[in-house]
Amino acid sequence: MGNNVVVLGTQWGDEGKGKIVDLLTEDAKYVVRYQGGHNAGHTLVIDGEKTVLHLIPSGILRDNVKCVIGNGVVLSPEALLKEMKPLEERGIPVRERLFISEACPLILPYHVAMDQAREIARGKKAIGTTGRGIGPAYEDKVARRGLRVGDLFDMEAFAEKLKEVMEYHNFQLVNFYKAEPVSYEAVLEEAKGYAELLTSMVIDVTDELDAARKRGDKIMFEGAQGTLLDIDHGTYPYVTSSNTTAGGVAAGSGFGPRHIGYILGIAKAYCTRVGAGPFPTELYDGLEKQDPVGKHLGTVGHEFGATTGRLRRTGWFDAVAMRRAIQINSVSGFCLTKLDVLDGLEELKICTGYKMEDGSVLEVSPMAAEAFEKATPIYETMPGWSENTFGAKSLDALPQAALNYIKRIEELTGVPVDIISTGPDRNETIIKVHPFEA
């Protein structure tokens, strides 16, 4: 059972999943993406060299790891090919090790146009999407009008389907959003090129993963974004368009849920959020909220989105929201990242409850964004530490105050912290329990 591990974010994304996936894939044969698209940014630092991946699983930097993009991922062929190029220029074999489900919905130029037109139309009520066509592509999938990777291999049928769906989208773009239409001929010509370039990588992902499981190969499933951005369980409508939770693994890859052995939840030692939406423990947003501790977290933590480059909002660790993430994902253990960012703070706060307008106190976060926005955090204060934890590789190297902070998080959430990250490099990590050995 321990052969198959899920790594996912338990906050609002940007928790540091890429580094941990890269670290743990030393023991894996497969790394699988099961949801999202190129709106996710995973940053890896290996021997000081920085790599940012958006679509390709983080295991691509490990020579013997096969990387899989499951059917739950919305695939932009343009973005994928752009991402492959610099990796191949560095001598990393991508085509031989990257496999794509034929059932992946395609992101095409009209999805991007629709995404951006909608955000402009929303004005101050904008959700804060990346503008990369993710939501509209998922919409087409659910409406059963979407084009999929497998459609590229019958170009005559593809052209007919494309014409129909583009008439639908262009009508909305022109008549409702007062935007420019997207050229059918240009999109079709692009698609012909994609078919030729992607063919060799397309496989039956479900069959491949089942065969790997039967051989005893270790499989890692790499989540994108975070639990609180899940389309069903997040702070709706300020969410992404896919299931970012553990339940998304089976649906987004075709891998049977009974075969998942360990679920690793990734959480920062504090909280961040990009874009709009409620954030009860928020300290700093660069605009209205200018708390110096929040600014410290953003500056020292280099809190800028890997995909958007946008400044992340920062705040204290939220055990209330974490309890909800644990319920949804049945988290086996945590990896606490960016512990070193807290170095030098005299005191730390952990949110232990939400006080609501009616005077009630919630110990588990509510579902709706409206309720989130009315929550006042109840804090527990703990002493900080002045010692340097950056790059620590053992518990003995951590000050007692840091150990106390970690222990308190375990007590408040009821889940053990099995891994602690103390820097961006893969070796700046303390592993108490290895997920593949749990």
From Swiss-Prot:
Active-site residues, as the UniProt record annotates them: D14, H42
GO molecular function ontology, one term from the record: adenylosuccinate synthase activity
Binding site for substrate: A306, T307, T308, G309, R310, L311, R312
Cofactor note: Binds 1 Mg(2+) ion per subunit.
Binding-site positions, IMP: D14, E15, G16, K17, N39, A40, G41, H42, T130, R144, Q225, T240, R310
UniProt subunit comment: Homodimer.
Natural source organism: Vibrio parahaemolyticus serotype O3:K6 (strain RIMD 2210633)
Family: Belongs to the adenylosuccinate synthetase family.
The EC number(s) this enzyme carries: 6.3.4.4
SUPFAM superfamilies: P-loop containing nucleoside triphosphate hydrolases (SSF52540)
Family annotation (Pfam families): Adenylsucc_synt
CDD domains: AdSS
Catalytic activity: IMP + L-aspartate + GTP = N(6)-(1,2-dicarboxyethyl)-AMP + GDP + phosphate + 2 H(+)
Cited InterPro entries: Adenylosuccin_syn_GTP-bd (IPR018220), Adenylosuccin_syn_Lys_AS (IPR033128), Adenylosuccinate_synth_dom1 (IPR042109), Adenylosuccinate_synth_dom2 (IPR042110), Adenylosuccinate_synth_dom3 (IPR042111), Adenylosuccinate_synthetase (IPR001114), P-loop_NTPase (IPR027417)
Any one of the GO BP annotations: 'de novo' AMP biosynthetic process
CC cofactor: Mg(2+)
Binding site residues for Mg(2+): D14, G41
Main location: cytoplasm
Residues noted as binding GTP in the record, renumbered to the chain: 13-19, 41-43, 312, 338-340, 421-423
Function: Plays an important role in the de novo pathway of purine nucleotide biosynthesis. Catalyzes the first committed step in the biosynthesis of AMP from IMP.
GO cellular component: cytoplasm
Entry's localization field: Cytoplasm
Protein name: Adenylosuccinate synthetase
Keywords per UniProt: Cytoplasm, GTP-binding, Ligase, Magnesium, Metal-binding, Nucleotide-binding, Purine biosynthesis
Pathway of action: Purine metabolism; AMP biosynthesis via de novo pathway; AMP from IMP: step 1/2
